[in-house]
Amino acid sequence: MTTLGHNYDNSLVSNAFGFLRLPLEFNPYATDADWVITGIPFDMATSGRAGCRHGPAAIRQVSTNLAWEGCRWPWDFDVRKRLKVVDCGDLVYEFGDAQDFCDKLQDHAERLLAAGKRMLSFGGDHFVTLPLLCAHAKHFGKMALVHFDAHTDTYANGSKFDHGSMFYHAPNEGLISPAHSVQIGIRTEFERDNGFTVLDAGQVNDRSVDDILAQVKQIVGNLPVYLTFDIDCLDPSAAPGTGTPVIGGLTSDRALKLVRGLQPLNIVGMDIVEVAPAYDQAQITALVAATLALEMLYIQGAKRGDD
């Protein structure tokens, strides 16, 4: 992990503070944390505009604007009193060595899960989800995937390290069950017979939130769920700072309502990926990513009952 053997964060792309102004915890495996935030500054699998290695820092920086509220609207409790959350800084790996990255991220995730922690991760390009799925499946078994994106990322293009191929590899490796997985906000071409339920952006924008959530819950069933949110699921008007923006996406309001409605699911791991601050305007992409991350923590805190 970032700081093993050190008392500082030695990532070249991180901040000096954690998400929501949390202090950085340099030995997350030994803490009493419920959820551990990990920054994953990796964008070597990007096919379009690079730069999302700076996503974790951008999300953390703008999250300072969210830290002042005790109870985040519309919730009636302070998530920091319901959950013990720590930020362990950024994963450090040999830059230019994608295999070293995969090995170190999977090892870090396996150690956290073995210690009883859950993970909220900030990418980085979407390829980072694959080693995270490997670690989570080793711990929880085959999972359902709830995937927000403009792209299905199920493309069999023969590339080992590609941010468009993770969900082609994951079913083949037995990590997730496509029959119990749903992809939300899709608006690019994809193979129609890959086994996933695809809710394209047109129907997600036109149908009611309650109707969509009912379908998601039916598809997922009782399986453990991994939740992954590619920020390009949102329309570029809400999230311009990403590598492969696609017009016609979700609004931030609809995305927040959908994430909020996932509270009943057995979510065992979560990530937000593809924030590329070089293309952002007034930090709005980083802000919506940080807000979605906070919402993800709130749906976990809501399971804990009263303070």
UniProtKB/Swiss-Prot annotation:
Pathway: Amine and polyamine biosynthesis; putrescine biosynthesis via agmatine pathway; putrescine from agmatine: step 1/1. HAMAP family: SpeB. Catalyzes the formation of putrescine from agmatine. PANTHER family: ARGINASE/AGMATINASE (PTHR11358), GUANIDINO ACID HYDROLASE, MITOCHONDRIAL (PTHR11358:SF26). The keyword Cell division does not apply. It comes from the Bacteria. It catalyses: agmatine + H2O = urea + putrescine. The keyword Cytoplasm does not apply. One of its GO terms (molecular function) is agmatinase activity. GO terms for biological process: putrescine biosynthetic process from arginine, via agmatine; spermidine biosynthetic process. This is Agmatinase. Its cofactor is Mn(2+). Its EC number is 3.5.3.11. The gene is speB. Mn(2+) binds at residues 126, 149, 151, 153, 230, 232. Keywords: Hydrolase, Manganese, Metal-binding, Polyamine biosynthesis, Putrescine biosynthesis, Spermidine biosynthesis. Belongs to the arginase family. Agmatinase subfamily.
